């Protein structure tokens, strides 16, 4: 099982896939952690940690995959996102779940075939690969990105070394 997470300070999408064979992948579960902009950052980080911890207490993936931090035009936004990513990494690390990172371009290439694919193209391909029409909804972009990260990891040698073929 692989969990992909598309981190955000207001919405973090997560998606868990089952890899039955190297190219036979099924969706297990998915969702979005939606936080209120009215809450303080401290409260949001706490809620993010508690919600993801609850998911990880129910399902223990072999790996957690995050989108790598990118340089943001606004340094404050990058710092806030980095802190949120840290909370997500901690939730996995406390359960001894290995954490991997991929750039958005690598994840898009794994799913769509090109690194500069639009969010809609990622949604469409994730929907087709996993047969999940819900992912096409406009409020599911973060979930589709999380699935793309998980699928990307499933196609790497790092995951096949875990014994899944």
Swiss-Prot record:
Gene Ontology CC terms: cytoplasm; Holliday junction resolvase complex
Catalytic activity: Endonucleolytic cleavage at a junction such as a reciprocal single-stranded crossover between two homologous DNA duplexes (Holliday junction)
UniProt remark on cofactor binding: Binds 2 Mg(2+) ion per subunit.
Pfam families tied to this protein: RuvC (PF02075)
Active-site residue list: 6, 67, 142
Enzyme nomenclature, EC number: 3.1.21.10
Cofactor: Mg(2+)
Xref: PANTHER family: CROSSOVER JUNCTION ENDODEOXYRIBONUCLEASE RUVC
Family that this chain belongs to: Belongs to the RuvC family.
Identification of the protein by name: Crossover junction endodeoxyribonuclease RuvC
Lineage: Bacteria, Pseudomonadati, Chlamydiota, Chlamydiia, Chlamydiales
